[in-house]
Amino acid sequence: MAIAKGCLPSNVVPAKIKRWLESEEYSCVQIFGELARNTLFSYVVTLSPEREFVVFQPSNKNDSIHIAGALVLSADQIKKLRKKSKDEQVEIFMELRLKLASLDVEFSFEGREVCRRIGINHTIYFDGLTKDRLLKAISMFNKAYSLASWILKKSI
């Protein structure tokens, strides 16, 4: 099968992405084994001591790359959230939904009676994959993460 002009062959994508991440001085570590299950490659990238995300290619979607991570609520935030009424909790997470919906990310709220973490994912596709597109995707993830963090700090 011919590769379209400007597209990278899939066998060079992992090394190219690692090189792009390192050229921006991101700490980037490839993960293997159970932690990287169902992926063709997976890198943990550290933006700051409190912010990490994963860049990976799912084994069942060989035309896409995901930038994903989670904002984990602290024990103190969970405690404060529990003290709020159900209506107040719904209002906080409705605001989060409305603000995150305007960004090009998928998100999920995880937890039983109280949300404990917010999953954030941004997908990019191989056709025309460039360093610019990868870094813009990371920026979008970072904006969504920051926005969710700020709203939680303000609301809880």
Question: What name fits each language-model region?
Answer:
Residues 28-36, 98-119, 150-156:
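Short glycine-rich, low-complexity/disordered patches
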Residues 1-62:
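Charge-rich, low-complexity N-terminal segments
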Residues 73-75, 124-130:
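A generic structural motif
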Residues 70-117:
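Short, internal acidic amphipathic alpha-helical interface segments
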Residues 63-68, 113-126:
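Glycine-rich, often proline-containing surface loops adjacent to acidic residues and nearby aromatics
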